[in-house]
């Protein structure tokens, strides 16, 4: 009997243990972040359970309301939003919440306030629920740097000021990918234990990938650099093999694959959406934060994505993120275009 292997299997690094270990590196820490994260983790477990039984519990149908983005809300969207708002408020560690589903920011009542602001998309890719495609929750965390009354300005900060970001993907397995600014780590939910276990320590994206991920249905509306780049992916002139196209249409699934296998995810501006489609605070920033922490890059077509300073909580931006070398290529095409102009 292999006792060493058995011991290894029973010495599980749960997400709570992992975050506590990180916390111990900072003697001045009071554990507020650990408590906040435990509430986010609970929200993810709740939503994972709801997603898994959505068809059976009739949570799939439209709720008959339209959210701030003009998208009809599904019941599961509404439920997920309620779960995360309640989990974050009850943690006693937040002051401002921004959700994709709510038109205005939520300001926590004074007695329950803490030093963090959380921006999140409670259920990204929810149009894919009916067909069982992977969907997910995306979140980013800022620190409140004053004790005055919180305002929207507390979250309208560049992404480089985030202290943590992550996503939870509800697919063939439930996986939570997290960065607190010291690398990227992946935790998989063990359903028998009800715990997220560290399965992907220190994720590093390959420097170059052979996959590109974009909605080619919008190709006729793209600008020059995006058109040239995708053409180059499909018909390389330097003798290298063509890249493969992989596009799910659920940002969490597409970015997750890009993070693990390498390549590039593109959601460019086009004639229909001149400012891009993805929201800066709770889609572009968290995913860009994770990509950079894993050794990749994130670019808006004009600048480093994390250097953007949003002016509105639901502001949108184009985004190109993924392997370092692949993003370098599209940056070069935009630089070329700028020289011409």
Curated annotation (Swiss-Prot):
One of its GO terms (biological process) is response to fructose. Pfam families: FBPase, FBPase_C. It is found in: Cytoplasm; Nucleus. InterPro entries: FBPase_C_dom, FBPase_class-1, FBPase_N, FBPtase, Fructose_bisphosphatase_AS. GO terms for molecular function: fructose 1,6-bisphosphate 1-phosphatase activity; metal ion binding. Keywords: Carbohydrate metabolism, Cytoplasm, Hydrolase, Magnesium, Metal-binding, Nucleus. The keyword Nuclease does not apply. Disruption phenotype: Slight decreased in growth rate. PROSITE patterns: FBPASE. GO terms for cellular component: cytoplasm; cytosol; nucleus. Its main location: cytoplasm. Mg(2+) 2 binds at residues 100, 121, 123. Coiled coil: none annotated. Substrate binds at residues 124-127, 215, 247, 267, 277. Mg(2+) 3 binds at residues 121, 124, 283. Catalyzes the first irreversible reaction from fructose-1,6-bisphosphate to fructose-6-phosphate and inorganic phosphate and plays an important regulatory role in sucrose biosynthesis and metabolism. Its activity is essential to regulate starch levels. Functions in fructose-mediated signaling independently of its catalytic activity in sugar metabolism. May act downstream of ABA2/GIN1, which is involved in abscisic acid (ABA) synthesis to regulate autotrophic transition and modulate early seedling establishment after seed germination. Belongs to the FBPase class 1 family. In plants there are two FBPase isozymes: one in the cytosol and the other in the chloroplast. This is Fructose-1,6-bisphosphatase, cytosolic.
């Amino acid at each position: 009997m292999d006792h060493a292997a058995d011991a290894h299997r029973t010495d599980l690094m749960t997400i709570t243990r992992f975050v506590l270990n990180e916390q111990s590196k900072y003697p001045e820490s009071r554990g507020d972040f650990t408590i906040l994260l435990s509430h986010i983790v609970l929200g993810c477990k709740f939503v994972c359970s709801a997603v898994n039984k959505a068809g059976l519990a009739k949570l799939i149908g439209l709720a008959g309301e339209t959210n701030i983005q003009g998208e009809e809300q599904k019941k599961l969207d509404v439920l997920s939003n309620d779960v995360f708002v309640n989990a974050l408020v009850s943690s006693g560690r937040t002051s401002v919440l921004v959700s994709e589903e709510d038109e205005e920011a939520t300001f926590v009542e004074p007695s329950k306030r803490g030093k963090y602001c959380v921006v999140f998309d409670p259920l990204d890719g929810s149009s894919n629920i009916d067909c069982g495609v992977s969907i997910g929750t995306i979140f980013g965390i800022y620190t409140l740097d004053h004790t005055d009354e919180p305002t929207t300005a507390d979250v309208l900060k560049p992404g480089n000021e985030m202290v943590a970001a992550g996503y939870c993907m509800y697919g063939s397995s439930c996986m939570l990918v997290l960065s607190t600014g010291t690398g990227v780590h992946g935790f998989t939910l063990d359903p028998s234990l009800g715990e997220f276990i560290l399965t992907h320590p220190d994720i590093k994206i390959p420097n170059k990938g052979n996959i590109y991920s974009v909605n080619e249905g919008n190709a006729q509306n793209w600008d020059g650099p995006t058109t040239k780049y995708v053409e180059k992916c499909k018909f390389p002139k330097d003798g290298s093999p063509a890249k493969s196209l992989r596009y799910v249409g659920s940002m969490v699934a597409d970015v997750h694959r890009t993070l693990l296998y390498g390549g590039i995810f593109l959601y460019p501006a086009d004639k229909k959406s001149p400012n891009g489609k993805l929201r800066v605070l709770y889609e572009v920033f968290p995913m860009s934060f994770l990509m950079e922490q894993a050794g990749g890059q994130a670019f808006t077509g004009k600048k480093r994505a994390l250097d953007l300073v949003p002016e509105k909580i639901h502001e949108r931006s184009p985004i190109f993120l993924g392997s370092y070398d692949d993003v370098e290529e599209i940056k070069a095409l935009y630089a070329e275009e700028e020289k011409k102009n």
